[in-house]
């Protein structure tokens, strides 16, 4: 995950401006696997949402991401949760992310960097208050964990 953030930040058309704490999360969906690590980042970019998605997918491929099993183990998973006030409903790009408000493992790190961000008419902090964060723990408090 740190490598993916550094790769984004190294691009001339992207700048990582904030990164959440790193969280360890029990597996979700398919539970017979190791814990996941989750974080969120705020990225300023001159790329369109679709172009940013293409960059993220390239980073995933370079990091040997294989899409074998839904909710299964993976080396990296980069999602675009929001993109300004834009809405996208294509199969490959759904923004805002359609399930982000149901997932504490998304909302906790997102609240670290954008607690007041409105998503579907409510701030992230409100969505987080309604979610089940059981088992999610901070793995690294240092917000510079990704810098290596």
Region spans (language model):
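N-terminal beta1-alpha1 ligand-phosphate binding loop
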Residues: 1-14, 20-24
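Flexible, gly/pro- and Lys/Arg-enriched active-site loops
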Residues: 13, 28-35, 50-53, 57-148
């Amino acid at each position: 995950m740190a490598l993916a953030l550094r790769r984004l930040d190294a691009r001339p058309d992207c700048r990582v401006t904030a990164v959440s704490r790193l969280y360890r999360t029990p597996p979700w969906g398919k539970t017979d696997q190791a814990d996941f690590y989750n974080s969120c980042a705020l990225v300023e970019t001159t790329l369109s949402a679709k172009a940013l998605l293409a960059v993220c997918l390239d980073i995933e491929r370079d990091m040997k991401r294989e899409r074998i099993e839904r909710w299964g183990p993976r080396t990296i998973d980069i999602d675009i949760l929001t993109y300004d006030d834009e809405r996208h409903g294509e199969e490959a790009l759904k923004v805002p992310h359609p399930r982000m408000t149901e997932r504490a493992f998304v909302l906790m790190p997102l609240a670290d960097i954008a607690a007041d961000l409105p998503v579907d008419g409510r701030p992230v902090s409100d969505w987080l208050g309604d979610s089940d964060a059981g088992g999610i723990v901070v793995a690294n408090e240092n917000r510079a964990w990704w810098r290596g």
